[in-house]
């Protein structure tokens, strides 16, 4: 009768387990390295973003203290510039606080049934004066869109509409158009916000939801804002367990789309 070598099977099983364990450990090490790199980059970005307005404010104030305060030709202008940079600093801190609360789950979602079209109309009305400065028209893709009821956190979705519409105005063309559209899907409503602005090059699309990511740093910084608007949008959508996507053609325009659960 032929004997069975159990020791060989045990050794093979042990080798397999060790190999799997080593592979898992390597993945964890790589993940930790990736997280550490992300942490370094993130804090470096925060430092850079805060330094810019702080240095500007400091420069204007010191210039005023050195005598410009009594020069009527420039004192008011320097105070205005300092105020603008103070507002930018405030925006960055406020948006960082929003992201921190979203990350930590401190702000649980208040899921309610509401009319998404009505909410969009409210935000459009609020943004019309801002859009008018660039003669941008805020409208719906359909002349008489139907009412759609969804179940979500209403104030968070308001923040999404606001951030995306502000983004479309900021990078929109003079006399351009931003359109909001709603589409029925099986269990969801697809919401799209499209503009005919400057668009985004394909190489930048995977990164536009990253914190502080700027397609063109000098141009974007001159546009103001915190650099966190789209990151906040992504956080809110993911908190709902859903996804957001973006399509863009450079020089033609950009469309953001996200889904919400039907009520």
Protein language model annotation of sequence segments:
Residues 168-169:
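Short helix-loop "hinge" at the ATP-lid/N-box region of the Bergerat-fold HATPase_c
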Residues 241-242:
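Conserved glycine-rich
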Residues 84-92:
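Short alpha-helical segment of the dimerization/phosphotransfer core of two-component systems
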């Amino acid at each position: 009768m032929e004997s069975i070598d159990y020791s060989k099977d045990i050794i093979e099983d042990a080798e397999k387990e060790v190999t799997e364990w080593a592979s898992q450990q390597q993945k964890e090490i790589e993940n930790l390295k990736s997280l550490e790199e992300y942490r370094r980059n993130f804090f470096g970005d925060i430092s850079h973003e805060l330094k810019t307005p702080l240095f500007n404010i400091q420069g204007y104030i010191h210039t005023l203290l050195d005598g410009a305060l009594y020069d009527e030709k420039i004192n008011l202008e320097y105070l205005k510039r300092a105020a603008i940079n103070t507002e930018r600093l405030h925006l960055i801190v406020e948006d960082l606080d929003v992201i921190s609360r979203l990350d930590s789950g401190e702000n649980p979602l208040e899921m309610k049934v509401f009319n998404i079209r009505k909410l969009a109309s409210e935000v459009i009305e609020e943004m019309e004066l801002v859009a008018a400065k660039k003669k941008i028209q805020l409208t719906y893709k359909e002349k008489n869109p139907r009412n759609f009821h969804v179940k979500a956190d209403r104030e968070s979705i308001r923040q999404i509409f606001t951030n995306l519409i502000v983004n479309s105005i900021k990078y929109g063309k003079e006399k351009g158009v931003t359109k909001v559209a709603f589409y029925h899907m099986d269990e969801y409503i697809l919401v799209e916000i499209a503009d005919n602005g400057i668009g985004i090059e394909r190489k930048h699309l995977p990164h536009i939801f990253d914190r502080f990511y700027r397609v063109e740093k000098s141009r974007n910084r001159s546009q103001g804002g915190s650099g966190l608007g789209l990151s906040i949008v992504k956080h809110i959508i993911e908190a709902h367990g859903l996804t957001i996507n973006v399509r863009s053609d450079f020089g033609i325009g950009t469309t953001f789309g996200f889904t919400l659960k039907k009520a």
